[in-house]
Regions:
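N-terminal capping/lid subdomain adjacent to the active-site entrance of alpha/beta enzymes
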Residues: 1-161
Length: 165
């Protein structure tokens, strides 16, 4: 299939600062992939590449160059994804796989689930961002009330006294 991938960079702003062991995020750069084909006029596939700065293995200085090459390779291979060449770049592989899957689904919904309809979340891990003790405790309580059975704490360098636990 003849195809074209447009890369659309965006800078997202967190609603509240997100603390990690590597610093505090207030913004995050992402790249949206817009897949089209003259063989299927009007059909699109959207993917997202979003490595976390200082945390993702593919957060590299030349990320945009690698992403552009991966997109050109997909075009050259007529929409066939070269998974082996992208093993070291999981965020790029995810973005391209998602764009391709979305394209061939022929609809804005990747699959019809309560999650994709925005009716429910996926309570796998309730992530608690770093903050002071009271803020983190409040987040824990909210996650437990929301039904999370596994809670992941991002405590980094924060000292938590055993009297608090």
């Amino acid at each position: 299939m003849d195809c074209k991938v447009e890369i659309i960079p965006r800078l997202l702003h967190f609603r509240q600062p997100a603390g990690t062991s590597r610093g505090i995020y207030t913004t995050r750069k992402v790249w949206y992939l817009h897949l089209t084909s003259p063989d299927f006029p009007g059909r699109v596939g959207i993917g997202e590449c979003a490595p976390l700065p200082a945390l993702s293995c593919d957060d590299l200085p030349d990320y945009e160059v690698i992403l552009a090459k991966a997109c050109r390779r997909l075009e050259e291979r007529q929409g066939r994804l070269d998974v082996d060449s992208l093993c070291d770049y999981p965020s790029i592989l995810f973005g391209l796989e998602t764009a391709i899957r979305h394209f061939f689904a022929g609809s804005w919904a990747l699959c019809d689930t309560a999650f994709s309809r925005g009716e429910a979340g996926i309570p796998i891990n309730g992530l608690i961002w770093m903050g002071d003790f009271d803020k983190m405790l409040s987040q824990i309580e909210k996650k437990m009330e929301a039904g999370f059975r596994c809670i992941k704490l991002k405590i980094g360098a924060i000292t938590v006294s055993y009297t608090h636990v």
